[in-house]
Amino acid sequence: MAVSGILGKKVGMTQLFDEKGDVRPCTVLQAGPCVVTQRKTAAKDGYDAAQIGLVEFVKESRLNKPERGHLGKNNLPPVRLMKEVGIVVDAAASEGNGDATKIGDRVLVDIFDGEKFVDIVGTSKGRGFAGVVKRHHFRGGPGSHGSMFTIAGSIGSSAYPSRVFPGMRMAGHMGNARITVRNLRILGIDKNENLLVVEGAVPGPNGRYVVISKAKKPPRERRGFSADTGPINPLKASKRLIKKKS
């Protein structure tokens, strides 16, 4: 399967212990199963992509008429969520010998076999109307008597500029925004349950839907650091290299 991403749901956070005994905070994601509902091609649409739907129990009456028609013409089951993800065009497809991605194909968590990092797009938790101290980490006013503790301060002088500049950090709605977290390390894959375990936090509360895709810019291995084993002692590494050469 040439699809580069999958739809999923945040299950929750837990922790794992690596070989050294260190604790690694991780997030468990329900990745799929999904089905390809539409195929975009460069010849017809100007770009290559696949529209996939998350196969989850949903009443057909919950879908609107365009969605029922879109899925019904290809005899596809009702899906909870539909998103567009990129695909990798195979060599056979580029030569005109056929396309590996077709409508009705299943997309499972096994698309991340051999991958070390993923990018995750989700919606952060909504915090409601928040002040500048909570929203922008302002210091606030002095703690003496008669002062406003969480005051924002001046937002613009009266003489000049006589206006508030665009983008001024002020109190307002906080959270409930689209957040992209890049290069989360994959710690485990459960193909039977379609579970994906990644290191670190994922935006949003438990049960919120996310888009999981292969890392666009995976980190390079720095000198003296291995992505699998962690920091490397350069002295011991050089001694091992000398032994191999001898």
Question: Over which residues does each language-model region extend?
Answer:
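Extended basic (Lys/Arg/His-rich) segments that typically form rRNA-contacting surfaces
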Residues: 1-246
